[in-house]
């Protein structure tokens, strides 16, 4: 980052006895009240000196530390916000919340949406998977944690507070709130970047432990910007945002001084596991030294840690191996906590996106449970974690979690049973396995690298498993959907959206403000542009007595562009007519999609989320998350509930609400259909059934749908089901077509319609019986022909030969192998003779060579030769 001279030379530092120094080890600048300090406080420049020597007078539990932080800042005018889910439904570019600022990116940080409070304080559960391989090993790494924050959002017109107040608040909380000696605190200068924003930052350390980061976000990504961080250029933005992050778990650990962070935050669960497993005790003295050594080299290296321990403990290597089970205890509890947060957000394990990350944690936890001999279950650990955090995760779907885990455990056991067969197959194809093969085995089959390594050792083979193996795999799955920006060369003309003013408007008159070729932009339009899974409207414009058809309608920002099959000049008024039959069917299908989604949640469970949608004129499709097959009985139940609601005639309302007012009322279900970057959310609500942010056109009452019929339900990928349906007139046509087909069948069978299913079933059974009889007769015929076949060859090498059709080769081969008979089959293809040797004794190629003096095609079980001479 280009140096911004003095931007962190704050009055608070200068007036509070701080000195700015340069670390003698890493060269970073830092602020301290300790005249003797010459290192920045960060590891490896400083060691962990708080273990067994806490600088906090009182020992805090996790909940006590959270309460202390929140109350401290509430007293100082900060609005408390409840935590968001760990799955950011309000964003499409990331899979999990990694930090509290994710709650406000990009809608608040861009200035589009007003913050829900200013300033605010909260404790946000977060999940980071980049260090998953180090969990349990270093004593400090976690996959899930709570980020405490006190943030302010400053605009050009109003400054709430900025750098001076932020640092002052931090210092006061640590000293007055927790009782830490100010001389033990150091503030290290370091630039920060993330989520398209950046700014100067201070990292806060106490006795070697980083407890907070204070970010002063005032920059945005800009390829021409004057500032650079990690190869990305930035420029100043209009807003100045205080983005702080205090590690709740680390502050709790600091207050207790335990050997590891796990013992500070999971004391009761650890005790439970040790009482119910083969792990009897913890060598706390040695474990403390392991943790201290692990921070002295980045990235973590086991060999380095052992070498440091051997300076003090002659048997360090042996003791290091002995504590690995303890580390598995820490790992499975940590992973259970992350899973508790994921399941509370209704994540369904799968092979893609956030579901993949959940499955990875589940399988790592199962392996740790196996290694430690824990006699409980993963569900027990998740339940205990929820008990510890029920204040911040009040609603926990226990039955959903139990159902999902039972399915996942069976899949895991299946991998354990059949994994070696898959490994053997890969070895036979490739010989030596590589890192890419390890990743493939884990990614596609769920076989852990530890399992592969152990199995290869039994076969005298070796493979290196990198310490960051899971981080390598995660990089393939961690990115969310990055929205493709729509670029256009059109002028920025705001087109009034008549289809919102009156969705039932069929005709209108507008002024052409821009024309180029066969494209025009009007001052207003009733033509709906493509968006939200709803296709664009069709219709025509009347100009000079001619009809010019509209073939496409697209929206770029606030500009709506109409593509025509002719040309209309700029500056003229035109009369537009919507293809109303098409639009009305699209409106029926769009409203039906919302209705169906609400009913699916009601019938299948709250875990159902929209995963994709496409509306059309004749039928529409809705993709949902679900973990069990949807059977015919369930489909009938869904259709009947939809029909009941249609008969009730629920109203459909459309309102434009402020972001946070809408979220407070409806929750994050609002974003099932997408995330609008607008100051307000257009909420479409079907009374008591569904409420979503939606930009489509809708009916006024669901009674106008008339009828809905599910045409097909299919699993399009693991735990994603596609429901194809028709509503309104297309559904009526579907019923009519079905009746006509049924009537035709009943006429042919001379049976009433209500009896045709039974009649067809009987016919089908009779047909199946006939096929079996024919197959049996065919088999007996082939056996007789083999038994009575003449032989060809020379004495000692004679083989039966039979004539047959090429289509019979498969059946002949099965019979020959069952009877262990080597034979020749003669077939005729395009006037040529083909001779096929079938040999259960594995000498088919040799048979062709000896009998026909020819080079055969095929293998030792079946080989063939074609005589090029025609009959």
UniProtKB/Swiss-Prot annotation:
CDD domains: AlaRS_core. It is an enzyme of class 6 (ligase). SMART domains: tRNA_SAD. One of its GO terms (biological process) is alanyl-tRNA aminoacylation. Belongs to the class-II aminoacyl-tRNA synthetase family. Catalyzes the attachment of alanine to tRNA(Ala) in a two-step reaction: alanine is first activated by ATP to form Ala-AMP and then transferred to the acceptor end of tRNA(Ala). Also edits incorrectly charged Ser-tRNA(Ala) and Gly-tRNA(Ala) via its editing domain. This is Alanine--tRNA ligase. The gene is alaS.
